[in-house]
Amino acid sequence: DLYNEPGGSGGYRYGERSLPLLQNIFTWGRTVNPSQPLSAGVWDMSLTNLNKFQLENSDVITYHTYEGLDSHQRLIDTLKQYGRPMICTEYMARTQNSTFQDIMPMLKKENIGAINWGLVAGKTNTIFAWDTPLPDVTEPSLWFHDIFRSDGTPYSTEEVECIRSLTK
């Protein structure tokens, strides 16, 4: 992606005011005659103008969602109309009912690439959900993200087996 989460996220949102920057980024990207596809991932369906530009100008459709199976499938069905390859650049949030066992089989069936950004529990603290107060740093019973503990053992052997079976 040339631009992650156009419109902003977290504490401050630029919203549709990010459109001129997004347009410039694609112009700059095209001027170097890239050998790789250009994209900017859709992430907030309320940003209508940004999404329209992203979807019309991306060589491959990238998106992210942390929603569960049904919502994720609806988003895929919407994005299919662009007739381009798709990559889900962020997904899987156990605390939001978005799990490897639910989402990965659907992505495989739909022939959609997937990027999992959390791998090993560590300094990024992605075992904890975003914007969640941490009274202490005790390991939560339900991790938000990540697959392995820092010693290399899996958080869930069932998840690891699911991932292995789907990626062979």
Residue ranges of model-derived segments:
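Extracellular glycoside hydrolase catalytic/binding regions
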Residues: 1-157, 162
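Non-catalytic accessory regions flanking glycosidase/transglycosidase catalytic cores in CAZymes
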Residues: 163-168
